Amino acid sequence: MTDPARPQWNPDQYARFEAERDRAALDLMLRLPDDLDPREIWDLGCGPGHHAALLRRRHPDAAVHGLDSSAAMLERARALDAAIDWVQGDIAVWTPDRAADLIFANASLHWLPDHETLFPRLVQALAPGGVLAVQMPLGHATRHHALLRDTAGRGPWAGALSGVERTPPLLDPARYYELLA
């Protein structure tokens, strides 16, 4: 049986909301420096590969790598773009063979604990002048998530759902500034 607290990634279900998911990633890409000329790009938590493929189109001379923990997502990514190096692994212990010029992490790092250790480690994986581009959603703080938590805690399903709730380990923005400065 699968662990109910561990997210299961279904590429078909994930694709149903592709436009909504892509919006934040595209905004993040648009914030990358215009003069960025990376040789090594890593997309951490690449899922089905759309963002890594866009990064490869934007930087065709770069070696692009996509890292994800889901074999099903990586299978979909490989079908999308065989020229990208797709790697199954865990962001929490990931270390690149070569320093990265761009580490792109859209909606992936909020799943991981211990940002006090994770973020400095990601910065250490960058080449001099490299860019760490991160977007983490704050969905858990919205009203609809509060209603979902309330509903999950009541009714005949409450016992089956106990222990499943997970609050992302996000820090105060000022603390991220301190870690990255």
Regions of interest found by a model, annotated:
Residues 40, 130-131:
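Short glycine-centered segments of the SAM/dcSAM-binding site in methyltransferase folds
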Residues 116, 131-181:
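Conserved catalytic/acceptor-binding region of the Class I
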Residues 102-115, 138:
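A short SAM/SAH-binding and catalytic strip from SAM-dependent methyltransferases
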